[in-house]
Regions:
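RNA pseudouridine synthases
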Residues: 1-352
Length: 352
């Protein structure tokens, strides 16, 4: 990555610029400092105590090399739907039934395997650095950093609460379609009985941790409810646990509800993910990122960076959920899931 230092950064310490402006983590910075050509200014290796000047050319060796790409993922040719890609990140639409990471029994059928094949074909070193993960049977948006620096930047944005994930789910049972933005706060814990199942609990008695979900009912019909939802926190199985706790389990969820002949998986899809683009602008002014949808042109295309340095991804529904929505709900429900900024605003607190 090459950056031309602007006049506004005259006199700043390089360390400050790397950490606050570019958002590099301490771990990423340490690796760059140990690399012979990790950080160069005007072609010369410098320390992070270097004082920047207008017109300096900063070069950061943040690309993986065969030596640094130590992760071994078997390249496997699998279907791969790319929503957006640049030098720093890639956004993908993960299909249902595909694990995110390799594991025992899933060594060559995962999203990581598909990406490894893509980059092996281009003769590029590969390390899989996803921003979070989706359950095998959950479809939708997965974003990954293509470099250590970009991944560190994404991780910082996530910790600062600047990343917004939106899901669409089909629930069993009919909620009240009142158009209200609902907020559910119910702590979640992992019972000691083993297995992967989580439950709503009490922080005092079983160590349950805080969990919050926002949701809005889009449509009801034929004994089911279509909801748009946002996990404000990121607990394991959070949406599945919360809706089951309300008495409206996700359709096809054989852990928190029951299996369904209509779908052979739980009807949950990661529809959209909004995040600040790595290195797009000054990172220290976090307040500017607080409400990225406010004032945004409703006709602005998704899956492209916005003028203010955000990316709002959008993953179309897979065939099984698209068919279920068509079978269960009126046509207006499909209009409520149109790929527009207006749809994204349905879960924005500032719009409630």
């Amino acid at each position: 990555m090459t950056i031309h230092i602007p006049a506004a950064c005259e006199g700043r310490l390089l360390r400050s610029y790397l950490k606050l402006t570019l958002g590099l983590s301490t771990a990423v910075l340490a690796k760059l400092k140990n690399h012979e050509r990790g950080i160069l200014v005007n072609g010369e290796r410098v320390t992070v105590r270097y004082v920047l000047h207008e017109g300096d050319i900063l070069e950061i060796q943040d690309r993986d090399t065969p030596e640094t790409a130590t992760e071994h993922v078997i390249p496997c040719e699998l279907p791969l739907s790319v929503l957006y890609e640049d030098d720093h990140i890639i956004a993908l639409n993960k299909p249902p039934h595909m694990p995110t990471h390799p594991s025992h029994g899933h060594l060559c059928d995962t999203l990581a395997n598909a990406l490894a094949y893509r980059y092996a074909a281009a003769d590029e070193p590969f390390v899989f650095r996803p921003l979070g993960r989706l359950d095998r049977n959950t479809s939708g948006v997965v974003v990954a950093g293509k470099t250590r620096a970009a991944s560190g930047c994404l991780g910082r944005s996530l910790k600062q609460g600047l990343v917004t994930k939106r899901y669409v789910a089909i629930l069993v049972g009919e909620m009240t379609a009142d158009g209200t933005l609902h907020s559910l706060e119910a702590p979640i814990y992992h019972p000691s009985t083993g297995g992967i199942k989580r439950a709503v609990g009490d922080p005092e008695t079983n160590g349950a941790v805080y969990a919050k979900t926002l949701y809005r009912v889009l449509a009801t019909g034929n004994g089911h409810t279509l909801v748009l939802c946002q996990p404000v926190t990121g607990r394991t199985h959070q949406l599945r646990v919360h809706f089951s706790h309300l008495g409206y389990p996700i359709l096809g969820d054989d852990i928190y509800g029951k299996a369904s002949p209509r779908m052979d998986r739980h009807a949950l899809h990661a529809l959209s993910l909004s995040l600040p683009m790595p290195f797009a602008r000054m990172r220290e002014d976090v307040a500017e990122y607080a409400s990225p949808l406010v004032g945004l042109n409703p006709d602005l295309p998704l899956n492209l960076p916005t003028p203010d340095g955000y990316l709002h991804t959008w993953a179309p529904l897979p065939t099984d959920m698209e068919q279920a929505v068509a079978d269960l709900f009126p046509q207006e429900a499909r209009l409520a899931l149109a790929p527009t900024v207006t749809t994204l605003k349905a879960l924005d607190v500032s719009e409630a």
